[in-house]
């Protein structure tokens, strides 16, 4: 079993903190394993009795009755009500499958899973943990629905460091596999490449697409697929719903509305399939509305979406770096800086402006810088920031790390992903 110590330790630190622990992330990224295996076995090792851990998996048929939140709440209360001296743990998996129901015993008012979990939270002998695969369970929604009393633990597919801890062997070979097949936990345990491709393709088509269509009652699954094809082929490129709509209109010979594209993009982000990096004006200290960049939560899913036809190592590397920074808890934007050195003012791009509290770094992703022209193209925007924050160029084509004459740190991708270098 692959260790997910970063997330496990976060759960352990927040035990009995008086809040509901909400574990979010794309489906099949390891949320259930984290809660129902890793954390479960940790509790058993600490002496917690097995019958004091209440496990409810809402995507399993034997637990379908608990999709009614009133039934779930009542059954849990029966287990713990007369045992105030004992400590119980409640695990609820894939909580987004619950329904809103009417409580006929209380005037027919509508009741949600949030209402019932808030009621259960009032029991001092119960510590509550739930998982969910939809971003409506994130940020302000968690604060609102759980009345400001929730701790969020967002789980991602395996980082390269986690992936390599499982597969071991030659680091470059492992990185090549990671760039092609990504970090979905089950893939890390597979050896046959056909099995990996089949698993990722089925995951995409039979789980994610169906989830998005059914959950949001989408009428145009074909448009959703076209949008996903387009974003997969354009990772690392600036785009927006209007340009996507125009491209699809041209390709499909039918009018595709920008509002439809924008709505469908939101649904894919709600499902954690893709995420958006906004453009940030470094000198003006403000955000642009459009265009932005879209990245896949797992690069293997992106490659599966394109049937492994479009192997673009430069943009794939950029996607992997973005994901790694997000996994580390950083705030990541696409940097823009105005070049006034010539008569024509040009907006130049820095791949990532990375903020962690009051600390900032700039990162350029450079697959190859084997000519002076390429080196100038990658570094000139870094020279225009006008500040003294650290500037890093992450590369695939160098045998060791070094500082150049401008003080920019050139770092091997493998060293960055294995956290063998300090960012700040």
Describe each PLM feature range.
Residues 135-151, 167-168:
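Short regulatory helix/loop adjacent to the ATP-binding pocket of P-loop NTPases
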Residues 24, 28, 33, 40, ...:
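A cross-kingdom feature that marks ATP-driven nucleic-acid transaction machinery
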Residues 96-129:
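Conserved Walker B catalytic segment
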Residues 2-18:
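Pre-Walker A adenine-sensing motif
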Residues 91, 127-133:
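Structural recognition of the conserved hydrophobic beta-strand(s) that form the central parallel beta-sheet
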Residues 156-157, 161-338:
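Interdomain hinge/linker elements that couple catalytic modules in large macromolecular machines
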Residues 44-60:
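Conserved catalytic segments around the Walker B and adjacent sensor/switch elements
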Residues 55-85:
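Short glycine-rich substrate-engagement loop in P-loop NTPases that contacts/grips substrate
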């Amino acid at each position: 079993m692959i260790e997910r110590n970063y997330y496990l330790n976060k759960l352990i630190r927040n035990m009995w903190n008086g809040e509901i622990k909400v574990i979010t992330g794309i489906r099949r990224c390891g949320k259930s394993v984290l809660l129902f295996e890793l954390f479960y076995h940790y509790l058993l090792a600490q002496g917690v009795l097995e019958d004091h851990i209440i496990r409810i998996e809402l995507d399993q048929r034997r637990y379908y009755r608990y999709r009614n939140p009133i039934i779930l709440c009542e059954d849990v209360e029966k287990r713990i009500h007369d045992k105030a001296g004992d400590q119980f743990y409640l695990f609820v998996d894939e909580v987004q499958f619950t329904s809103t129901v009417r409580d006929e015993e209380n005037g027919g008012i509508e009741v949600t899973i949030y209402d019932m979990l808030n009621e259960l939270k009032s029991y001092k002998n119960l510590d509550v943990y739930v998982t969910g695969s939809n971003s409506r369970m994130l940020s302000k929604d968690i604060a609102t629905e759980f009345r400001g009393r929730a701790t969020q633990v967002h789980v991602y597919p395996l980082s390269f460091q986690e992936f390599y801890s499982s597969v071991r062997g030659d680091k470059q070979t492992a990185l090549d596999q990671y760039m092609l097949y990504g970090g979905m936990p089950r893939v890390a345990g597979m050896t046959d490449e056909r099995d990996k491709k089949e698993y990722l393709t089925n995951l995409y088509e039979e789980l994610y697409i169906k989830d998005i269509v059914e959950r949001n009652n989408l009428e145009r699954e074909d448009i959703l697929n076209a949008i996903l094809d387009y974003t997969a082929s354009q990772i690392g490129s600036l785009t927006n719903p209007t340009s996507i709509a125009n491209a699809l209109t041209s390709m499909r010979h039918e009018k595709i509305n920008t509002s439809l594209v924008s709505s469908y993009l939101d649904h894919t982000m709600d499902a954690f399939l893709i995420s958006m990096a906004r453009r940030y004006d470094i000198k003006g200290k403000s955000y642009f509305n459009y265009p932005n960049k879209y990245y896949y939560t797992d690069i293997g899913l992106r490659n599966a979406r394109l049937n492994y036809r479009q192997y673009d190592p430069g943009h794939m590397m950029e996607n992997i770096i973005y994901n790694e920074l997000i996994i580390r808890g950083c705030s990541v934007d696409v940097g823009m800086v105005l070049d006034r050195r010539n008569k024509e003012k040009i907006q130049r791009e820095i791949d990532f402006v990375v903020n962690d509290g009051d600390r900032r770094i700039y990162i350029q992703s450079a697959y190859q810088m084997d000519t002076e022209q390429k080196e100038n193209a990658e570094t000139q925007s870094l020279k225009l920031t006008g500040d003294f924050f650290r500037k890093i160029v992450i590369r695939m084509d160098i045998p060791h790390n070094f500082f150049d004459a401008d003080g920019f740190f050139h770092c091997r991708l493998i060293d960055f992903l294995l956290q063998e270098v300090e960012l700040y």
